[in-house]
Swiss-Prot record:
Required for the insertion and/or proper folding and/or complex formation of integral membrane proteins into the membrane. Involved in integration of membrane proteins that insert both dependently and independently of the Sec translocase complex, as well as at least some lipoproteins. Aids folding of multispanning membrane proteins. This is Membrane protein insertase YidC. Interacts with the Sec translocase complex via SecD. Specifically interacts with transmembrane segments of nascent integral membrane proteins during membrane integration. NCBIfam families: PRK01318.2-5 (NF002358), yidC_oxa1_cterm (TIGR03592). InterPro entries: Membr_insert_YidC (IPR019998), Membr_insert_YidC_N (IPR028053), YidC/ALB3/OXA1/COX18 (IPR001708), YidC/Oxa/ALB_C (IPR028055), YidC_ALB_C (IPR047196), YidC_periplasmic_sf (IPR038221). It is found in: Cell inner membrane. It comes from Borrelia turicatae (strain 91E135).
């Protein structure tokens, strides 16, 4: 088999394993996006709601909303805005995490027909104006009274922010019958999570629900569920984007869970008390990063005393997570020394390439040794071209006599693939790369593509002129040329495509990928070029001896 065919075989095998890995990772480890963007998570009591009630029509709702006031609250990490209509949280901005326009990221987009990031409703009975009272710097209370079936109820919503600037909000609700001697005539209450987390997917254009997915965690597993009804005890439910999420936890949830079209629909809870009712929810609204999420697993690490909530399970673990963890630690060490994530990616890539250099060297040396046998191999191929069995026997004999393994050039390449995928996954999903600048004015955010010019509209499928994809393509071509011992004129059309078409194809595939990922790819290409040059010099010296 010629050297070019062996290289082609290695490329085919690499592409095959790339496809298998992406399929497995997508099926078992990636998020599934729901088909409906309305996020409504309801909690209904376990007896039928069949009593008459007084509903509020749409005109009354609009009138109340128009007369409502907004209450601004600032904490160390949040800009929060409450509305006295419903006592709901209608805006929640993250102070320390900015979008491309350098404004705090908005965790909720409120439309006319929606009432905030999360809210409690007893049918339409609580769509009313609330009074506001600031209990202390961290606790804010909203209160209202309403009439239902000739009985009067007091409804209180109490929000408590973390005293330690944790991305968690405690929501307590209290429903009291003003006449304590009477039982409740209300059998229905619903918790609604309507999270439209902000994404800036195109320059200057804010979008919501992009890359938004729902998940539910129970029985020690992160699940997306199947359509139908099942009885579960979830620890939390939530909505996530690539970098941010809203998760809701409640103690002792023993519920019936109904899911339709991969969208969370209904939870059935236990019956409320006779004359009073209270409940507590914990809402995480912040970065989708284990450093922020895992503190709620131990009660001594958070101001709310929560433990074993396991919010961190919302961050899916890749198939190669065990490789990504040490890589992330190494990258963090580099950042602590030189606080630039772009340089950390470069240094990490160099470290990884040095560690796998023995495999690369072995692969290239095996290929070089096989190339020395080309004259003898061609003689055998010509001599036994009409006898395939004898041809294979003679080729095997030649390999044994020369001490050459024909697969020696392929296996080391395949062994490097897990490292490649682990580094790819780390750079592509690492939260701390969001908003991290490498070269100001050019690469201002490692989590999105670089840009030197913005068109203001789409040209073909692009909105920006980017430099990194061109550098990636050129270095990939140079790497391919240097690693090959076959001249261009001796290549067939299929071989020419694999050698030179693949870098061009990757140029289009990776054009809009995060710049951090392209920096990793370019560093790999440059290191490979230098590495191949060194190996060729080493092999040449061995031949001269």
């Amino acid at each position: 088999m010629s050297q070019s065919k062996r290289i082609l075989r290695a490329i085919y095998l690499s592409l095959f394993f790339i496809g298998i890995f992406m399929l497995v990772d997508d099926v078992f480890f990636s998020r599934k996006s729901p088909s409906v963007m309305e996020r409504e998570i309801g909690f209904n009591l376990d007896r039928d709601f069949d009593v008459e009630h007084h509903s509020i029509d749409e005109n009354d709702t609009l009138s109340l909303s128009a007369n409502s006031k907004e209450i601004g609250v600032e904490t160390g990490i949040y800009y929060a805005t409450f509305s006295t209509f419903g006592g709901n949280l209608v805006s929640l901005k993250l102070k320390d995490h900015l979008n491309l326009e350098r404004n705090p990221t908005e965790m909720v987009k409120v439309n006319m027909d929606r009432e905030g990031l999360f809210y409690i409703t007893f049918d339409n009975l609580t769509k009313s104006l609330f009074s506001y009272d600031k209990i202390n710097d961290y606790t804010h209370e909203f209160k209202t009274k309403f009439e239902y079936n000739d009985k009067y109820y007091e409804y209180i919503k109490r929000y408590t922010f973390s005293s330690k600037d944790e991305y968690l909000i405690k929501l307590e609700i209290f429903l009291n019958n003003v006449d304590a001697n009477d039982n409740f005539d209300i059998d229905f209450y619903k918790f609604v999570l309507s999270s439209d987390i902000e994404n800036l997917s195109e320059r200057g254009k804010l979008q919501y629900n992009n890359y938004l997915s729902q998940s539910i965690y129970y029985d020690t597993k992160l699940r997306y569920g199947k359509d139908g009804l099942s009885v579960i005890k979830p620890k939390w439910v939530g909505s996530s984007t690539k970098y941010f999420e809203v998760l809701v936890s409640k103690e002792n949830m023993n519920v019936e869970f109904k899911q339709e079209n991969k969208v969370l629909k209904t939870f059935v809870l236990n019956k409320i008390g006779d004359t009073s009712f209270s409940d507590t929810f914990y809402i995480y609204a912040g970065p989708r990063d284990n450093g922020y999420l895992d503190i709620f697993n131990e009660n001594n690490l958070n101001s709310f005393g929560l433990s074993n909530v396991e919010f961190g399970m919302s961050v899916e673990k890749s198939l190669l997570y065990f490789i990504q963890v040490p890589m992330q630690l190494i990258m963090q060490i580099f950042y602590d020394v030189i606080p630039n994530w772009g340089l950390s990616i470069i240094f990490l890539t160099i470290v990884v390439r040095i560690l796998i250099f023995p495999l690369t060297f072995k692969s290239f040396r095996a290929t070089a040794e096989l190339s020395k046998l080309q004259p003898k191999m061609k003689e055998i191929q010509v001599k036994f071209k009409n006898d395939p069995k004898r041809l294979n026997e003679e080729m095997g004999k030649l390999y044994r006599e020369e001490g050459v393994n024909p697969l020696g050039g392929c296996l080391p390449i395949l062994l490097q693939l897990p490292v490649f995928f682990a580094l790819y996954g780390l750079v592509n999903n690492f939260f701390l790369l969001r908003g991290a600048s490498f070269i100001p004015g050019w690469i201002d955010d490692l989590s999105i593509g670089d840009s030197i010019y913005y068109f203001g509209y789409k040209v073909f499928v692009w909105t920006d002129i980017r430099i990194l994809p061109f550098i990636m393509m050129i270095t990939q071509l140079l790497s391919t040329i240097i690693s090959s011992n076959v001249s261009f004129k001796n290549l067939g059309s299929q071989q020419k495509f694999l050698y030179f078409g693949m870098p061009i194809m990757f140029f289009f595939i990776l054009y809009d990928m995060p710049s951090g990922l392209l920096i990793y790819w370019i560093t790999t290409n440059i290191f490979t070029i230098l590495q191949q040059y060194y190996i060729k010099m080493n092999v040449s010296e061995r031949r001269n001896r």
